[in-house]
Design a protein with these regions (language model features):
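Alpha-helical transmembrane segments and their immediate interhelical/interface regions
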Residues: 68-87, 138-169
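Alpha-helical transmembrane segments in multipass membrane proteins, preferentially the mid-helix core
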Residues: 34-39, 99-103, 156-175
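Hydrophobic core of alpha-helical transmembrane segments in multi-pass integral membrane proteins
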Residues: 23-41, 62-69, 188, 232-244
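Membrane-interface helix-boundary motifs at transmembrane edges
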Residues: 42-56, 105-114, 167-178
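Membrane-interface transmembrane-helix boundary segments in multi-pass integral membrane proteins
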Residues: 11-29, 179, 185, 196-239
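Aromatic-anchored segments of alpha-helical transmembrane domains
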Residues: 63-72, 122-133, 184-193
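A glycine-rich, hydrophobic loop/mini-helix early in the fold
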Residues: 51-104
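Membrane-proximal helix-loop-helix units in multi-pass membrane proteins
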Residues: 102-161
Length: 272
């Protein structure tokens, strides 16, 4: 148990980024994530908004509870009561520690925008924070406290994203897009400010650190000006692309349903 939590440092060697142990480990979490999202989403598809929201409330409580537990353990393990400074929810993935509770407990347009934000970024964070968490799986053994809690919290983010769309909680209204952008840009500003003051690498705005962002970091030669601008631009473009694809799929689905209903009506008329 001491070895799992990393007290005194991990004695086992990391299996490595994209090792078969890494892939099998995170894939197990992804399977559970998708299965539970489909189960609860389909079960609550035609339930009231309050019933649908209960699942999201539990997701909010669980993700924050695991994260708080992780921070406490890491502060004890590192014998540093200020260790929480480098564990602030200012990564793209960990923003869900705030936005999932916001989606669960707020009301009106703020709730709609928060639900859309979790829907848009939850699944992205789940994939990036598990399969592409190069820094974690290069530094820690696969079966370790750090990787286990990270996999759990990222899976909850992905679960919330999938559950929202499967249960029909998303709105994706044009009028709420500015609020979604405002949420994202606010976190980017806070992350960059924290990076300068601590210093740290929240939101990977300073460097790639073994993530896919390394590609863009190298493209701009590590420029402290252009690199963070590129990262933020990628976030904005992702929102636009996600919204565009969602709108297109929604439109095509509605057209197919309309066409099917017309054919059904014509068949019924012919039978009469």
């Amino acid at each position: 148990m001491k070895e799992f939590f990393g007290f005194g440092g991990y004695q086992r060697e990391p299996a490595g980024y994209f090792s078969w142990q890494h892939i099998v480990f995170v894939t197990c979490f992804m399977i559970v994530m998708v299965a539970t999202a489909v189960y609860f989403g389909r079960r609550n598809r035609h339930s009231s908004d309050s019933e649908k929201n209960k699942v999201l409330i539990w997701a909010a409580i669980l993700i924050d509870s695991f994260e708080i537990f992780k921070i406490v353990i890491m502060c004890i393990r590192g014998k540093d009561p200020m260790g929480w400074i480098t564990e602030l929810p200012l990564f793209l993935c960990s923003i869900q520690l705030i936005t999932i509770p916001l989606a669960a407990f707020s009301k009106g347009r703020v709730k709609e925008a928060a639900l859309d934000f979790v829907f848009i970024f939850g699944i992205l964070g789940a994939v990036l924070g598990t399969y592409f968490a190069g820094q974690n799986y290069s530094c820690y053994p696969v079966l370790s406290f750090d990787n286990a809690v990270s996999a759990v919290t990222h899976s909850i983010s992905g679960f919330a994203s999938l559950y929202i769309v499967i249960s029909g909680m998303e709105s994706m209204k044009k009028k709420n897009i500015p609020i979604t952008f405002a949420i994202l840009l606010s976190f980017c500003v806070m992350a960059y400010t924290a990076n300068v003051l601590i210093p740290y690498n929240y939101m990977f705005l300073m460097r790639g650190d073994g993530t896919p962002y390394d590609i863009f970091y190298n493209l701009v030669g590590g420029s402290p000006v252009f690199y963070p601008m590129v990262v933020v631009l990628l976030f904005v473009l992702y929102i636009c692309a996600f919204w565009g694809v969602y709108t297109f799929v929604k439109k095509k689905t509605a057209e197919r349903k309309l066409h099917a209903n017309v054919e059904k009506t014509e068949e019924e008329s012919a039978m009469v």
